[in-house]
């Protein structure tokens, strides 16, 4: 942690070590320094000056390689337009540092910690470097407890661990970002904790939607910014690869401060962790490294590990991380999602088939897993109910070929009952979201774990066999389903 004596972080650079640009290839710069004054790897370099049109230039780079002959190769964190050979480069003598603490809440930052929301400067007296070691083994906390989200399918079948790492897997357009927005909304309301959102290489429109959504739902308090519950860090699709590769670390650094210094439980959302790998792959190619499997960088697992190992619970506080993972071509064996799997406590897999049926959230109940779904952690009742739901859905899946060829009438009485219950369960796993009220037209619902278990137990026991399956679609708890069934009966 470094404390900057300059209030409001007015940057002044001491020009101790100055070099100049000798080569520019896209976002990669080669810089020459005087002998004996080479910057360290990961040091931050700053280039200031004017372009040919007289516009001010202020580009931050990060040293990646020492090339010999007093040359270093650095990757730019913003566009290199307007840079020329011979321009002066200042070595800051330290890694990139970003503002941390209460001043970051309610604000949007870019990768180098500058506010980009037009709300004026941020108090940057307390800053922290984005590269730091993971907590030591003896500092880690190993308590097991469930993190309730209020989303039925998640809490019942793949519960999240407090202080754990959760992956949301899905192809394009199946609802990862909407699910993340709902989790931020529910957690801010139910747990009152602080969240940090890292937008890594996703759409600018989604980032803007999220910001507006947070202001409307009160997660960001426009009247009193310091009363907000979330800090946002964006490095969107249009940014150079250097920015997309480091923006996850910037968000993580802000979350670590809340955990280590403020001793809070923090939520870290990363959307999308695949783009972090993708940016690393682009940078790796630009630096001339030999590609590995499927064209990814050879350092894939090292880069992923250095980020993921810092996301953990210590004796001071916890970071619970929820990461969206884009799955290229819906192939879970691709090196990027496969490397991510190794670090996760729970996986929430989103299914295109369920999304096509209109069942949202489109969480696949059979593919999603959690290390927390053990009877000695969640209790016998929860475990038995979850297993009953999975067995019913698995049997329904096995029978689908027979139904497609021969029809329902050819099934035994027992199998027909299983199919009817499975279809009710499938629909009851859908739920109206607060953040999707504009799409669904239904008010959002937060369903507690006790209510969720009670509802599914009633379906499995056969108490609700007489109700039509459409009564279970897009409702909150089971009482709403029975009320909806009564309304349907009256209408018919």
Swiss-Prot record:
InterPro entries: AAA+_ATPase, ATP-synt_VA_C, ATP_synth_F1_bsu, ATPase_a/bsu_AS, ATPase_alpha/beta_chains, ATPase_F1/V1/A1_a/bsu_N, ATPase_F1/V1/A1_a/bsu_N_sf, ATPase_F1/V1/A1_a/bsu_nucl-bd. Its EC number is 7.1.2.2. It catalyses: ATP + H2O + 4 H(+)(in) = ADP + phosphate + 5 H(+)(out). It comes from the Eukaryota. Its main location: plastid. GO terms for biological process: proton motive force-driven mitochondrial ATP synthesis. PROSITE patterns: ATPASE_ALPHA_BETA (PS00152). Keywords: ATP synthesis, ATP-binding, CF(1), Chloroplast, Hydrogen ion transport, Ion transport, Membrane, Nucleotide-binding, Plastid, Thylakoid, Translocase, Transport. F-type ATPases have 2 components, CF(1) - the catalytic core - and CF(0) - the membrane proton channel. CF(1) has five subunits: alpha(3), beta(3), gamma(1), delta(1), epsilon(1). CF(0) has four main subunits: a(1), b(1), b'(1) and c(9-12). Produces ATP from ADP in the presence of a proton gradient across the membrane. The catalytic sites are hosted primarily by the beta subunits. This is ATP synthase subunit beta, chloroplastic. It comes from Cycas taitungensis.
